[in-house]
Regions:
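Well-formed, non-transmembrane alpha-helical positions, independent of function
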Residues: 17, 61-64, 86-87, 138
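Rossmann-fold NAD(P)-binding glycine/threonine-rich loop
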Residues: 76-92, 103-110
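Conserved beta-strand positions in the Rossmann-like core of class I SAM-dependent methyltransferases
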Residues: 5-6, 73, 96
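Helix-to-beta-strand junctions that scaffold the AdoMet/dcAdoMet cofactor pocket
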Residues: 66-68
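C-terminal hydrophobic helical "lid"/dimerization subdomain
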Residues: 12, 20, 60, 102, ...
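Adenosine-nucleotide cofactor-binding segment
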Residues: 1-61
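Short strand-turn motif at the edge of the Rossmann-like AdoMet-binding core
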Residues: 75-79, 98-100, 123, 127
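Glycine-centered, small-residue-biased loops immediately flanking beta-strands
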Residues: 70, 93
Length: 153
């Protein structure tokens, strides 16, 4: 497992929620653009980068804090982006794509059902399915929500 988890985002609400589920440190890169500078020393600090936003700037910032021969797992799908191949090659990064964790879905459901993983802190809103339009509008606004749940009971 990871010995230290650092999460970045542009909203304080999201960062507060990831602290609840175990992040050791959080950085709001919108209000503290130099918040990762301490991790840049000695060619990088982290062994693994999981980029979940699909944002080109987020991926590029990760290049600066990832150790040589580090692993980048790209989960976010933001369309076409440009990456500095010179850095990718010079630091010998291993860049991997991961699409929605298809293989892990059944395991994730099992862990939640057994109470071994608590996702409740990640759910910012829970609405009855009859309010699906409001739920989708909330889900589309990252400044208002993190994860929106529809209930059917």
């Amino acid at each position: 497992g990871a010995t230290e988890v650092v999460a970045t985002d542009v909203t304080d609400q999201t960062l507060a929620r990831v602290r609840q589920v175990g992040a050791d440190h959080t950085v709001n890169v919108a209000t503290h653009p130099d918040g990762l500078d301490g991790y840049k020393a000695d060619k990088g600090y982290f062994d693994v980068l999981i980029e979940a936003s699909g944002n080109a700037q987020a991926l590029r910032a990760g290049f600066d804090v990832l150790k040589p021969r580090g692993i980048i797992v790209q989960v976010g799908t933001g369309g076409e982006i440009s990456i500095p191949l010179n850095v990718l090659v010079a630091k010998e990064f291993d860049l991997r794509g991961s699409f929605r964790f298809h293989e892990e879905f059944a395991l994730a459901v099992e862990l939640m059902n057994k109470g071994l993983v608590d996702v409740k802190p990640l759910i910012s809103h829970s609405l009855p399915y009859t309010q699906f339009e409001e739920a989708f509008a909330l889900a589309a606004d990252r400044h208002q929500s993190m994860k929106v749940q529809l209930t059917f009971a």
